[in-house]
Amino acid sequence: MYLLFCPCIREPGLRASGITTERDILAFDQVLSRCRSYGIDMRFLPCPETLYLGADRSPATFSERLDTPDFRHLLDQMEREIRSTIADLGVPYAIVGVDSSPTCGVNKNWRSPTGRETGRGVFLDRFPDIPAYDVYAVAMSRIYLAGPLFSEAERTWNIRLAQYLRSYAYDVYLPQEIGDSSASRGMDAHLEIFSRNLSALENTDIVVAVIDGADADSGTSWEMGYAYAKGVPVIAVRTDFRMVGAIEHVNLMLEQSAVVTHNLEELREALPCPLPVS
């Protein structure tokens, strides 16, 4: 399994002058680190804008400077070369692009000065058969796994979920793995566990929360609420078939603040960019 990358993720200097932010650099670094940590093969595409306009260039939309026969000819040539590589290596799992780019955008692109348009940039649009993810989606690699951990069955399920998420190249923080799984502890241990869990919540990209049972675990509910208030996406896992109301699977405040999934397949589909590594 390998990924095709837009080259500016590794070399931000290829981008137009002045558009790359510190947040962009952090996302680029997180993506590269994720792939290196899990041994994911990274193949980098050439940059059509740099080849056509040069490295030191001001920002411009497609219609302003790229809508020319010469640029289309360049894209034709680049596509042939990339298709040849794919014929040798096999189809990549996905392309990692950079939204807003007129050539390498995934969900949005600058086609004209009137504003960003929905859809891929003109270069990535030549590969509709290959899934594409924006670099920010791939950078969301840290998961806080919240759930009850009081019984052997609960802890076993949590471990299974953590292993499942790690098999898609996610860095999973599981509280029970740092000692939050025993009733025999003093107040100092309570404070240490709370502080470590809170720090992990502060630095996570996603919260995955187990909400099985007649009522969701109170600690898990707190963690979900904290994440939601911080703007962190929450994905809930409820395999319990019981309902708490006519149309509610669980308390409506939890249900409305999360994407609720009911099995591992639905959980995988709800993740922003699962990368299979096992």
Model-derived features: positions:
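Short catalytic helix/loop segments, enriched in acidic residues and glycine
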Residues: 21-39, 161-166
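Divalent-metal-activated hydrolytic enzyme cores
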Residues: 52-86, 116-140
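Short connector loops at secondary-structure junctions
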Residues: 40-59, 137-139, 173-181
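N-terminal glycine-rich phosphate/adenylate-binding segment common to multiple enzyme folds
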Residues: 82-113
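Short Gly/Thr/Asp-enriched flexible loops that form oxyanion-binding sites at enzyme active sites
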Residues: 102-127, 219-228
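Short glycine-rich His-centered loop
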Residues: 9-21, 103-105
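Conserved catalytic or regulatory cores that recognize and/or transform ribose-phosphate-containing ligands
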Residues: 137-278
